[in-house]
């Protein structure tokens, strides 16, 4: 894992900055933090802007961010549900189970995925990654539905891992 790492000692959550080069190798990135016994992760996309306000070449693009999240999700959903906490995946499942987003930004109201997106509330640099988040939400939706339904039946979402084998 080449990205920066900051440890939040209060919550024991590792904040991992996902650099462009990390996003190109999502399976390696995932297996690296898994091998290091990291069990709680917040992913932070590396975003750097030039003087014109455009993303620099060192930044993660929306397309690459979406592919990265999907590949990471594939690793997680097949082997580590409830074993490794990835904040975005956990928050997405919570939204599928009924928690609501507060006040939405105007440009997010028409998005099919606004109820899931953590960035729909305020203007953030992450909003340049909307297409990547949308790709992830679209891809993960069938899996999230199954996990939601398992939870509603008072069963473990981990059962999905067996179903996917």
Please state what every model-predicted region is:
Residues 100-165:
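Flexible mid-to-C-terminal extensions adjoining Fe-S/redox cofactors in radical SAM and related proteins
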């Amino acid at each position: 894992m080449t990205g920066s790492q900051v440890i939040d000692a209060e919550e024991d959550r590792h904040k991992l900055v996902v650099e462009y080069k990390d996003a190109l190798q999502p399976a390696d990135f995932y297996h690296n933090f898994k091998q290091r016994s990291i069990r709680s992760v917040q992913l932070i996309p590396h975003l750097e802007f030039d003087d014109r306000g455009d993303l620099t070449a060192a930044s993660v693009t929306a397309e690459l961010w979406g592919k990265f999240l999907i590949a990471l999700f594939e690793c997680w959903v097949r082997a580590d549900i409830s074993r490794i906490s990835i904040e975005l995946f956990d928050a997405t499942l919570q939204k599928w189970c009924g928690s609501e987003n507060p006040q939405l930004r105007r440009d997010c109201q028409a998005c099919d995925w606004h109820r899931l997106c953590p960035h729909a509330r305020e203007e953030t640099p992450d909003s340049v990654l909307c297409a990547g988040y949308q790709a992830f939400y679209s891809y993960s939706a069938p899996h999230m539905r199954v996990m939601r339904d398992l939870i509603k039946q008072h069963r473990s979402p981990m059962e999905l891992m067996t179903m996917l084998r």
